[in-house]
Amino acid sequence: MPAPDDCREILERTWGALLPPGSRCGLALYPDHWNVGDAAIWWATRRLLTDLDVTVAYACDPWSYDPRALGASLPDGPILLLGGGNCGDVYPREHACRLRILADFPERRIIQLPQSIWFRTPAAIATMAEVTGRHRDFVLLVRDHASLDVARAQLPGVTAILCPDSMLALGPLARLAPATVPVLALWRQDSESRGPLPALPAGWVARDWTLAGGPLPATEAAQLSLASRRFLERVGAPPAWPPRPPAADEAARLSRRRIAWRHLPWLWDQLAEDRARRGLRILSQGRVVITDRLHAHLLCLLAGIPHVVCDTANGKVFAHRDAWLGRHGIRSASSAEEAVEQAASLLAALDAAGEAAVAR
């Protein structure tokens, strides 16, 4: 099994074969929400594209996608769809935009960056199969063997390639703050969770890193998020879904949007990096971390934070582990209760042997 550093080399090699140096591309599905994992994927994607000497000529999120603006900014060249875990019917907004881009550009090469595929209903995968079957050049990078099997068996016309998660392109990281609690349990509160945590020992902290349902914090990241929306509105790209009908002054609106796409990637890069670093700061609070989030696990791995990882309801965490990382010192638990037991043992080992020796 490759180590994390080897995974970065695989990403460079796989993406480099699809995107020659000096090429221009579009990059769709910017994640303008508070899931740290998706922000880290965008951050890693932009860094890797820069390293490969690939220029992003157009960027959009699901609200601001406009085929006319994309065509004007990028008359030819591939369109990239951000990687992650939203290829399926669990996250309809992102997936609907993915299908629309495939339908709008049936002759253009479209590259779906590394994804896990998860459909809950046969009708939903049949809809995607209908769209991919009409497309001439759709390259689908998948993060695990189960997704590869689905792509090859049920999505006609797709070139499916196994590839690690994009976030591993970040390479080695460091803790952003000293640990302040013995164990931090960063646990999902959504449909991908396999269940709640049990009662934790005194002093341990449980939380998630999304802000769904809560107010935005008064931070630079929140200000940037609001600024990005206001910027879209000023250039005639209001964040509406489904997209609004074309304006009467179509030529002027497209001109404003072409200017916008030259600046939006920079703005979104700052926001994505800030959100990803926020997640790493949260994880840095624990001497030991328990998590069922794939990207919390990967951030801990890259930053050398001792942790115990559990799987999600759709199996994507362990599927990625088994495809790319094997064991490599990864402590895995089959249940939240087992994760708590392992974390307690790991904490005792840190106390007995010293953190540096155990982390090695």
What is each model feature region?
Residues M1-R360:
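Active-site anion-handling motifs in enzyme catalytic cores
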